[in-house]
């Protein structure tokens, strides 16, 4: 096992992550260890990932077609990383390709632009989706949404109804593997079987799923095969700017590449262009070589830790957090609040403190406790409005305010999310902070910036230039 990537132990307060011992200033003076409850947004880098980057940099050169030693070594590392990614998701290499890009958003946009849609085609998606797995499809086909239940889960009966109602027109079922809002894990293989039964393919946004559970795309012809999977390294403890699309080759063998330029061609004249083979034809320009290698090392770390240990670690943290929240007056948890179900979901908990705006709760957690959370709608506006029971009339009123640059009343929740960097001590600190907020035991001087929808304190202005300079 690699140094810096040892298996997690919940009793330990820290794992070997870059910045795990960082101390941040507090409103009342002094500092506190930063408590990262924001892994659903992005993750800190594993120490072993940083070490892998350091190992590569002395040998870094551009990939492909270079004959120098450094170029050949970098090319070798880049392609070995591609192989590791394919193995990580269980891709059928005879029919699937691994394409590197910037992030999950770009991966799904690229698929939406390159997929061979026909007039009248339908993309079936759900109200649970992150905007990145909904907005790109609007430009490509008719989008039909599957409803969610009162508990925020995808309505399976509505899924079947809409697959049947649009049979023959549904080309893609585009779904999230796990919700970035409620942490629900979706039965994507079962949904793949249902989609394939009506002649559709399935796209899985695995941005939230990939760091926490194994993925098995399965072989071509398997009724439960996942045809397309997208995810990002920055959510997998390798925040160096890489996203991945693992795709059926057929969608990219037709037509011109999405991005054209150097490396995508075999030969160019003033009159003609001949594209090279996949995957190079879809990766024009110099790729993020360092980021790709970092992702491969992070994958190795996760596999060595083991998925059962990862799931057990995060389930213990999630159950402890839910139990603590249930004991605090005024805490409202959205979605499944049962600690007994922590093992069948991710450690993503949306909540509010009754009577306290979500933006104020997040500000107090940060300024007075050194806890990093996130608040708002998490790039899933329709889903959050649904679980908050926001009416259509309220929604239209809020839209008018936002378009007038007033975000003071935007609906939302606070989101605490856990990963391998967290310990039970982190949960305890979060619990003590929420107890204080529930009692209204926090500084009364916070001011709302209506245009940004954020609370700040006039007496607290950290000098970030002391921490980082270009």
Where on the chain are the PLM-derived regions?
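Pyridoxal 5′-phosphate
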Residues: 1-470
């Amino acid at each position: 096992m690699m140094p810096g990537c040892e298996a997690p132990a919940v009793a330990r307060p820290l794992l070997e992550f870059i910045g795990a011992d960082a101390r941040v200033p507090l409103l009342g003076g002094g500092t506190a260890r930063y408590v990262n409850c924001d892994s659903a947004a992005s993750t800190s880098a594993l120490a072993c990932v940083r070490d892998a980057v350091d190992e590569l940099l002395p040998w870094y050169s551009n990939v492909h077609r270079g004959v120098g030693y450094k170029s050949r070594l970098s090319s070798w590392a880049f392609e070995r990383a591609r192989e590791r990614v394919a193995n990580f998701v269980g891709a059928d290499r005879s029919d699937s390709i691994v394409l590197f890009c910037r992030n999950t958003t770009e991966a799904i946009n690229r698929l939406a632009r390159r997929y061979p849609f026909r007039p009248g085609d339908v993309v079936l998606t759900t109200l649970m989706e992150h905007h990145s797995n909904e907005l790109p499809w609007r430009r490509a086909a008719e989008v039909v949404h599957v409803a969610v239940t009162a508990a925020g889960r995808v309505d399976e009966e509505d899924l079947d109804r809409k697959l049947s109602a649009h049979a023959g027109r549904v080309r893609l079922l585009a779904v999230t593997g796990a919700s970035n809002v409620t942490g629900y894990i979706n039965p994507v293989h079962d949904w793949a079987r249902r989609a394939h039964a009506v002649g559709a393919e399935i796209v899985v946004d695995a941005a939230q799923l990939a760091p926490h559970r194994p993925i098995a795309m399965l072989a071509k012809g398997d009724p439960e095969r996942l045809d397309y999977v997208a995810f990002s390294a920055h959510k997998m403890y390798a925040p160096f700017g890489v996203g991945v699309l693992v795709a059926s080759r057929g969608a990219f063998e037709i037509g011109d590449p999405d991005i054209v330029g150097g490396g995508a061609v075999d030969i160019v004249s003033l009159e003609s262009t001949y594209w090279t083979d996949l995957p190079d034809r879809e990766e024009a320009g110099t790729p993020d070589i360092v980021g790709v290698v970092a992702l491969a090392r992070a994958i190795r770390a996760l596999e060595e830790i083991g998925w059962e240990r990862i799931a057990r670690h995060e389930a213990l943290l999630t159950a402890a957090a839910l139990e603590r929240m249930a004991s605090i007056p005024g805490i409202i948890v959205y979605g499944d609040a049962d600690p007994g179900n922590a093992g069948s979901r991710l450690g993503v908990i949306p909540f509010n403190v009754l009577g306290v705006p979500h933006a104020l709760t997040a500000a107090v957690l940060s300024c007075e406790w050194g806890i990093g959370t996130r608040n708002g709608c998490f790039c899933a506006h329709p889903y959050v409005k649904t679980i908050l029971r926001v009416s259509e009339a309220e929604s239209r009123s809020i839209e008018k305010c936002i378009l007038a640059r007033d975000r003071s009343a935007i609906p939302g929740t606070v989101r605490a999310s856990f990963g391998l960097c967290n310990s039970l001590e982190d949960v305890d600190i979060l619990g003590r902070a929420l107890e204080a907020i529930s009692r209204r035991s926090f500084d009364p001087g916070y001011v709302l910036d209506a245009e940004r929808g954020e609370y700040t304190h006039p007496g607290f202005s950290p000098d970030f230039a002391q921490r980082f300079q270009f």
